[in-house]
Amino acid sequence: MRDFKTYLSVAPVLSTLSLGFFAGFLIEINRFFPDALTFPFFSF
């Protein structure tokens, strides 16, 4: 039962960290390329 509680407590921590990292990544991209629907280095 203790291992099951440990397993259930790992998923929220990992999802919070991964979503926080992804949100920070998007914020930094929008800081360098504001309002970019297509990135400048992908346009030909």
UniProtKB/Swiss-Prot annotation:
Keywords: Membrane, Photosynthesis, Photosystem I, Plastid, Transmembrane, Transmembrane helix. It is found in: Plastid membrane. InterPro entries: PSI_PsaJ (IPR002615), PSI_PsaJ_sf (IPR036062). It is a single-pass membrane protein. Disulfide bonds: none annotated. The keyword Zinc does not apply. One of its GO terms (cellular component) is photosystem I. One of its GO terms (biological process) is photosynthesis. It holds the Pfam family PSI_PsaJ. Its main location: plastid. The chain crosses the membrane at residues 7-27. HAMAP family: PSI_PsaJ. May help in the organization of the PsaE and PsaF subunits. Belongs to the PsaJ family. This is Photosystem I reaction center subunit IX. It comes from Cuscuta obtusiflora.
